[in-house]
Amino acid sequence: MSAADANQVQESLEKLNLDSAPVASTEETEQTASGETEEAADSAQVSDTSASLYVGELNPSVNEALLFEIFSPIGQVASIRVCRDAVTKKSLGYAYVNFHKFEDGEKAIEDLNYSLIEGRPCRIMWSQRDPSLRRNGDGNIFIKNLHPAIDNKALHDTFTAFGKILSCKVATDDMGISKCFGFVHYETAEAAEAAIENVNGMLLNDREVYVGKHISKKDRESKFEEMKANFTNVYAKNIDLDFSEEEFKKLFEAYGKITSIYLEKDHEGKSKGFGFVNFENHESAVKAVDELNDKEINGQKIYVGRAQKKRERLEELKKQYENTRLEKLSKYQGVNLFIKNLDDTIDSEKLEEEFKPFGSITSARVMVDETGKSKGFGFVCFSSPEEATKAITEMNQRMIYGKPLYVALAQRKDVRRSQLEQQIQARNQMRMQNAAATGGIPGQFIPPMFYGQQPGFFPPNGRGNGPFPGPNPQMMMPRGQIPPPQGQWPRPGPNGQPVPVYGMPPVYGGDFNNGANGGRQQRGYYPNRNQNQKGRQQKDLAAIIANAPADQQKRILGEELYPKIVSTGKAQEPEAAGKITGMMLDLDNEEILALLEDDELFNTHFEDALTAFEEYKKSSEAATAEN
């Protein structure tokens, strides 16, 4: 390096000595392979024609409009996109800004990089779509043991003296606190080598930093396995608290030459009972582990084993827990039964008595709440699958204390949830196929501002014959609605849910006339409708609907219905207003227009839909509680 370059490096290092108070030291952190911390490793050289920028470290509240205000003064912006989660639609914390001119992109990086956006310093670099170039780590370096006060900008200012930086990042936790390591990606490998040569081992903010080439996760893992097989560092615990460091060393030096030793102590200088010993060669470390592990010293059995990093220990414990859990599950596979619909008087002893005739029971338990009252379900575990199968065959639907039992093999919660999702998906596919065969999806419209409602929104009744029987005093026809022709009542679908008769208006529960008269109703949908009394606003809306495309008509009507439903104050739950709106959108457009004009007619239909929603919610909650 020239004398001028050396002076520039020295100035950058001096600037980095921040005045902030030092914080508690952290463990030496190894290179991580997380997606967030390797973003710097993923960046690469950019072509001269590119004008697309990656903007990271964004506050979740930042949107496209705010970014346009910030970047548009630089030059003409072609497009801006904040990347969001596909399900929750929440910001992922980064965005792409596209300029028409490459020069504008360069200026944006120069002027706006690390500037505050909603209280957070943003990180801007060229977007590189080619994954092979993004993973090219020739110019990427890794820095660890950084001072916690060093941020992205301070790191960038220090290392920019060695060449053009494509990306620079200090790794942080979820709270935005530095993890004391980071990455710098240079445009050329030569610049990276110069940075390593000049900064590695230097003091930055009173800390000696390590600077080296970034190693990919795959290479790190292979190297880590090699280190595990040839370890020299040993961890010992359960050491006598009266042991001094000299005695601790004497305990291990008989097995080989020691390069370093450390006995952990508290703030008063007393031993914490554990420490580390590093041998010169692997054989000495293995010998110490073999001969000292589980050896009794001063009346205590000590543990001696290969020293592990915290992350490795946590992963190992997690694997052990998972293996134990799977072993336990496989042990009870096919022998553990779930029983529900139990009478409140049945306790664990009575439950065991009922199932005892079918085989040897290892455990039986009725689940109770905090007051000791039965929850109405329990578990019985047999010694063999054959006994469990026999119990299911004999006891399922058997009347015990006046209630039919439900008996089946017990399932894990995640398995039950997966099966339920599959059943829902299958029903949705069946409904879509049936709808496609009739040329549309009646009763299913989801405006962008609220949730729609599935057709035939009715809870199953308790009679077991579906929710739409024929002449039944308990079933009513909607006020003013023409009944379907004979034989066109909706048939029950899966789980008792009704499948709507296409081409017929949907049936809602609520304020109905008695259906025992065979469904004879006054013909005509709008008994209170008066065309001459329509207001100017309603005529305008009718004209808009008439001129709007067919696929937009329901959306327009939904935007009129939704605030009217919310204004009633009765749809208190978050999803209630949206679902009720979706139900009412199943009506014909003319009838919806009449509802918007006639408050009395609107209230009648609203109460019907609200009643149906509440009944459905109660049945859903009951089904969830049983499961």
UniProtKB/Swiss-Prot annotation:
Function comment: Binds the poly(A) tail of mRNA. Appears to be an important mediator of the multiple roles of the poly(A) tail in mRNA biogenesis, stability and translation. In the nucleus, involved in both mRNA cleavage and polyadenylation. Is also required for efficient mRNA export to the cytoplasm. Acts in concert with a poly(A)-specific nuclease (PAN) to affect poly(A) tail shortening, which may occur concomitantly with either nucleocytoplasmic mRNA transport or translational initiation.
Primary site of residence: cytoplasm
SUPFAM superfamilies the record matches: PABC (PABP) domain (SSF63570), RNA-binding domain, RBD (SSF54928)
Region annotated Disordered, chain positions: 1-46, 511-537
Biased composition (Low complexity): 511-535
GO molecular function, one term: ribonuclease inhibitor activity
Name of the molecule in the record: Polyadenylate-binding protein, cytoplasmic and nuclear
Signal peptide start-end: none
Polar residues: bias regions: 1-11
Species whose genome carries this gene: Debaryomyces hansenii (strain ATCC 36239 / CBS 767 / BCRC 21394 / JCM 1990 / NBRC 0083 / IGC 2968) (Yeast)
Family as reported in the entry's similarity comment: Belongs to the polyadenylate-binding protein type-1 family.
Residue ranges of every copy of the PABC domain listed in the record: 537-618
GO term, biological process aspect, one: mRNA 3'-end processing
CDD domains tied to this protein: RRM1_I_PABPs, RRM2_I_PABPs, RRM3_I_PABPs, RRM4_I_PABPs
Gene responsible for this protein: PAB1
Pfam family, one: RRM_1
